[in-house]
Amino acid sequence: MNTLNRRVSPIPYSLHAQGRVMNGAFRIDLRNDGRTAAEFQIQSKPDMDALRSYTVEAGNSLCGWWEGAAGTGEYDLTVHGPNGFFRNFRGVLSGADGRVVEVRTTYDVHPHGVRLELSNPTGQELIVSIFDRYNSRTTAFVVDPGESESRRWAVERTGGWYDLTVTVNGNRTFAMQLAGHVENGEDSVSNRLMEAFA
């Protein structure tokens, strides 16, 4: 099925949301590198906080903190922003033997792409997998203790859209889904997948 739809004009957004366990809680850093203010909405599952809204001015950043669910330490947080910007962070604050990876996202305008920098804050080797929803392909690689690995995905063929899910071998509770659109100042296409995120 062709998920690409009508042509759309460029918009002034360049958004980021980075999540990680820190000081016994889960922290999300929101950053707006665009030219206009952007509103983020963050929804948590039951036993945590309800919906929160954040307005981040152009060139600014904000952060929020969440405790894990009572009794389990589980977290499941979903971030929505303009133009299909989407992040989902799932896991347990204590992790599974500490097997977690930290992810930072950057965008390439020319050539059009999205890049993930994956850092291993633990003392053990991690096997990280990234599932690309657009081509149903999984990439797996090793991140050594205290080291980082960078992987890039071209998005020309998807009209600038991406949808990637990061998991760590041996930790079934941990996952990050990162999806949205990379703006490059040119006309693009809308995308029906943005209405069907898991």
Where are these regions (language model features)?
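Intrinsically disordered, low-complexity Pro/Gly/Ser/Thr-rich segments with frequent PxxP/GP/PP motifs
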Residues: 44-72, 132-163
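Terminal connector regions
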Residues: 67-111, 155-198
